Design a protein with these regions (language model features):
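Intrinsically disordered, low-complexity and often Lys/Arg-enriched segments
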Residues: 1-75, 99, 107, 411-414
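Gly/Thr-rich phosphate-binding beta-strand-loop-beta motif of the actin/hexokinase/Hsp70
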Residues: 68-92, 171
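Short alpha-helix plus adjacent loop in nuclease-associated cores
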Residues: 148-188, 331-340
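A short, charged helix-loop
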Residues: 173-201, 239-251
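Glycine-rich, often acidic, oxyanion-interacting loops/wings at catalytic, nucleic-acid
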Residues: 201-286
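Low-complexity, acidic/Ser/Thr- and charged residue-rich accessory regions of DNA metabolism proteins
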Residues: 330, 370-414
Length: 414
């Protein structure tokens, strides 16, 4: 028999789970097109706005935890995905999780979820982000489950034992605590829409083909160096350079370089085609000189949606350019950047900083560090990383309509 105080605590706990978190104080203003823009405290709102502006970010976590009808259960499913099968540990309500079971195909798991949903149960699923993409997540959501995808995690540090059943059991236990209100148990990621994922993949395919060109070009240099004792110049596969060096090659080396050159030219044509497609996305925009349409379009694709960030700290953290920290008490120690973020975006931003330092030195972030130049008048590398973090914040401000390029000090435009 529960006491009145215990009953009150349980009722309050249930109400707490149903109510979404209170939003942060925000200023709402109308843009020229009539779309409301939300500006949190500390960011200035201007009339400039990105073409796809909308008022609120997409939440990572469910805004409420549904309660099943009388006599029905809340089912928590921890999933470990493999190419051959799916291992699932299932917990009904707050009972002991059942031993892990295997589903031969994702379709079998989706059919099982549909069966439980048709019976009136609430189903939660969780699995780690991996190379299998988000197809399973889309199917589970369509089947009626509340599907969560998390970052790859070291689930158990205390044991030197790891297998599919142990991993799925740990995910199930963490999911149970997450549903009970412990949000720190799972690091939920934002799953992109299909259109966003395809737009992002275009830029990554371009990077893939560029990597192939570099690998094949280096292979050709190594081939000539081994058999002729001489190397090949940069872009040796280009028509002008190839016309000059072809008579100098021995028949043996030429026999291998000619088909290799054809493959490089085919890959180069693919890169050029993807570059035109990517730059066309921002062809009508005025872009700061040094940033360039290619970098801006690739950054937009990697972020997917700039409105996903609620404040300026979020895009800075997403780059992985924040310093690591090991502090205790009154002692604070910071170290190298944590690299906990999007590596593709981090590379784009760091490269853009070096160009902006030359072509747009009036950028407000660069002016602050003008006195930190070294003896050669160049920017130290550690400051370039800090500027890359600030550039992510400035891109977020511009793409969400909080500021303009001119207000941030970008005067040279293309």
């Amino acid at each position: 028999m529960n006491s009145p105080a215990q009953a009150s605590t349980k009722r309050n706990a249930r109400v707490y789970r149903l109510q979404p978190a209170a939003p942060a104080p925000a200023t709402v203003a109308a843009s020229p097109s009539g779309v409301a823009l939300v500006c949190t405290e500390g960011d200035r709102l201007t009339s400039a706005k990105a073409p796809w502006a909308r008022p609120a970010p997409q939440p990572l976590h469910p805004t409420e935890f549904p309660i099943p009808s009388a006599g029905k259960s809340v089912i928590k499913v921890g999933l470990d995905i493999d190419l051959q099968h799916l291992t699932a540990t299932i917990q009904w309500d707050h009972l002991q999780p059942k031993p892990a079971r295997d589903f031969k195909t994702p379709a079998d798991l989706v059919a099982w979820v549909k069966e439980q949903r048709s019976a009136g149960h609430v189903v939660y699923t969780v699995y780690e982000s991996c190379g299998f993409g988000y197809c399973l997540h889309y199917d589970l959501k369509e089947a009626g489950a509340i599907s969560l995808v998390i970052t790859p995690t070291l689930l158990d540090r205390s044991r030197r034992r790891k297998n599919d059943r142990l991993d799925s059991a740990q995910l199930c236990l963490r999911l149970a605590r997450y549903v009970d209100g412990h949000r720190q148990e799972l690091h939920v990621i934002r799953v992109p829409k299909v259109s966003e994922q395809q737009r992002r993949e275009t830029g990554r395919q371009r990077a893939f083909w560029r990597g192939l060109i570099l690998a094949m070009a280096n292979h050709g240099r190594a081939l000539r160096l081994e058999h002729e004792g001489r190397t090949l110049s940069g872009h040796w596969w280009g028509p002008r350079v190839w016309k000059r060096i072809e008579p100098e090659l021995t028949p043996f080396v030429r026999a291998f370089l000619e088909p290799l050159r054809e493959q490089i030219l085919a890959a180069k044509a693919q890169v050029d085609q993807l570059t035109v497609e990517i730059e066309a996305r921002v062809a009508r925009e005025k872009i700061p000189k040094g940033l360039g349409p290619l970098t801006l379009a690739l950054a937009d694709a990697e972020v997917c949606d700039w409105f996903r960030f609620a404040d300026r700290k979020a895009p800075a953290s997403y780059t992985g350019c924040c310093p690591s920290e090991r502090s205790t008490g009154g002692v604070q120690r910071t170290g190298r950047i944590d690299r906990h973020g999007n590596a593709h975006l981090r590379t784009l931003l760091v490269e853009a900083v070096w160009r902006l330092a030359r072509w747009n030195p009036t950028w407000h972030a660069y002016r602050k560090l003008a006195g930190q130049l070294n003896a050669a008048g160049k920017l130290p590398k550690r400051w370039a990383v800090a500027l890359a973090r600030q550039l992510a914040v400035d891109l977020w401000r511009v793409r969400t309509g909080r500021s303009t390029w001119a207000e941030l000090g970008f005067l040279e435009m293309t």
